[in-house]
Design a protein with these regions (language model features):
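Structural recognition of alpha->loop->beta junctions
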Residues: 87-106, 240-250, 306-321
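Radical SAM enzyme core and accessory elements
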Residues: 26, 31, 46, 91, ...
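A structural motif corresponding to the C-terminal end of an alpha-helix
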Residues: 19-29, 190, 277-288, 314, ...
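Radical SAM [4Fe-4S] cluster-binding motif and immediate context
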Residues: 132-289, 296, 302-305, 309
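Flexible glycine/acidic-rich beta-alpha junction loops that bind and position SAM and/or redox cofactors
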Residues: 83-87, 207, 259-264, 294-302, ...
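Residue-level recognition of beta-strand->loop/alpha-helix junctions
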Residues: 31-35, 51, 167, 227, ...
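Alpha-helical structural signal in soluble globular domains
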Residues: 21-25, 66, 70, 87, ...
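Acidic, low-complexity intrinsically disordered segments
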Residues: 1-190, 361
Length: 436
């Protein structure tokens, strides 16, 4: 299971992008993340913006109501709004849909004039050239492990039925990327050569990725990113990734059941190619962070043990598990609602760590217990030993993540409260990669 370290991983880049726009327009801005700074200022603001995912929409409504009672106008955006603007319109007076770069200047102008509209939306013609690097000047990063996170793009060219991106695509959203010059400039501005790209899909445009990595090659980075399984079809790009310092790739394998994958539109994933995919990364010294979703329609109680067996047999370095969750606005939600299988409408439980649907081939209790069991089994000391990476250079980062983030994460969390989470992150980076 994840500890609250996950929520303290890095600042929210969406809010920091808005902060950049606000600063560019000549205004003062303060960014607060409730995960790392629960004391929210209550006065001294002319406008409040809230970014929310589905699971915190209700919290956003409560918080927004508190500010409105103080006479402060409130606008709400984020993936929870962009993926289902109709639902959000019922909850909030003013919503923002799509990339902030396409409408936040209008929000600021209208707020200054006292005439906020009900809805602001970035048009479908929005160009990735308009995407901005975020500003970190307005946020206290000491409550986060890292501030070396960069998003080179927004969205994903795929639209898997259970993913936020499938809902966003229904409302005109699409994959766009920044310019190579913009991303490279942001990389160079960081005080570290360790970079985490947090794009939904770092190879959404393989041509862009190749051009970007070629530009970054001289910097000699250590970096990680998330990619889709079709990276296996791009051996030249994998070679370039390894040559430019790629340490780990997050990949949504999602299931060891082919029927489960086909049932949610995950056509780019082929179970028969999973072993080759893992080997393609390992042979280049790149670690695999495998994501799995449990509770899909072909899953049954045996799925959990088979997943653990596959992970151990293929020496997968890290595993992230999720419970199948029907985000409102997605095709998966529509089908679960149509089939009468949604058993919990409390949006705060839509965080992939609660069972909110009735699975086909097991009970909700079996699904939850199996989800927890995968975490426990993958991160036993014995299985951590069995999954040791072949590449010696990856041994220290592997052990740090498996032991001090997953297995003993609670102890690392306590250390963060004692010395500061930013210092914990800096110590981990130096121990793993011998760089600042």
């Amino acid at each position: 299971m994840d500890t609250s370290l996950k929520a303290r991983m890095a600042p929210h880049l969406g809010l920091l992008t808005i902060a950049r726009i606000v600063e560019d327009c000549g205004h003062e801005v303060v960014v607060v993340n409730e995960n790392s700074a629960p004391d929210i200022p209550s006065a001294g603001f002319d406008l409040v913006g809230i970014s929310a995912s589905i699971d915190v929409l209700d919290r956003a409504r409560v918080l927004g109501g508190e500010y409105r009672r103080l006479g402060v106008p409130v606008v709400v955006g984020g993936i929870g709004v962009t993926s289902n603007p109709d639902l959000a319109s019922e909850m909030f007076e003013t919503i923002c849909v799509g990339p902030a770069e396409g409408h936040w200047r209008d929000v600021l102008a209208d707020a200054a004039a006292g005439r906020l509209r009900r809805r602001y939306e970035t048009p479908m013609s929005f160009s990735g050239e308009r995407l901005l690097a975020p500003s970190f000047r307005s946020v206290d990063t000491r409550g986060c492990l890292y501030d070396n996170v960069i998003a080179a793009s927004r969205g994903c060219p795929f639209a898997c039925d259970f993913c936020y991106n499938a809902a966003v695509r229904r409302h005109g959203g699409r994959y766009v990327h920044r310019t190579v010059e913009s991303v490279a400039s942001e990389v160079r501005s960081k005080a570290t050569r360790h970079i985490m790209f947090i794009d939904d899909n770092f190879i959404g445009s393989p041509a862009f990725t190749r051009e970007l990595l070629a530009e970054l090659r001289p910097i000699r980075l250590k970096w990680s990113a998330a990619v889709s399984a079709n990276i296996l079809d791009m051996p030249d790009l994998l070679d370039l990734m390894a040559e430019t310092g790629c340490q780990s790739l997050f990949i949504g394998f999602e299931s060891v059941n082919p029927e489960s994958l086909s049932g949610v539109g995950k056509g780019q994933n082929k179970v028969s190619r999973f072993e080759a995919l893992a080997e393609a990364l390992h042979s280049r010294g790149i670690m695999v962070n495998a994501s799995f979703v449990f509770g899909l329609d072909a899953d049954d109680p045996s799925t959990f043990d088979r997943t653990v067996e596959w992970v151990v047999a293929n020496r997968i370095e890290t595993v992230t598990s999720h419970i199948a969750t029907p985000y409102p606005g997605t095709p998966f939600y529509d089908r679960m609602r149509r089939e009468g299988r949604i058993i919990d409408d409390d949006l705060s439980h839509y965080d992939t760590a609660h069972v909110v649907i009735r699975p086909k081939n097991m009970t909700p209790e079996e699904l939850y217990d199996g989800y927890l069991r995968v975490y426990r089994e993958v991160y036993t000391l014995g299985n951590i030993w069995r999954r040791l990476p072949r590449a010696r250079s990856q041994l220290m980062p592997y052990l740090l993540f498996n032991l001090f983030y997953r297995k003993w994460g609670a102890a690392s969390e306590r250390l963060g409260h004692l010395i500061g989470f930013d210092r914990v992150g800096a110590l981990a980076r130096r121990a793993a990669y011998f760089i600042r």
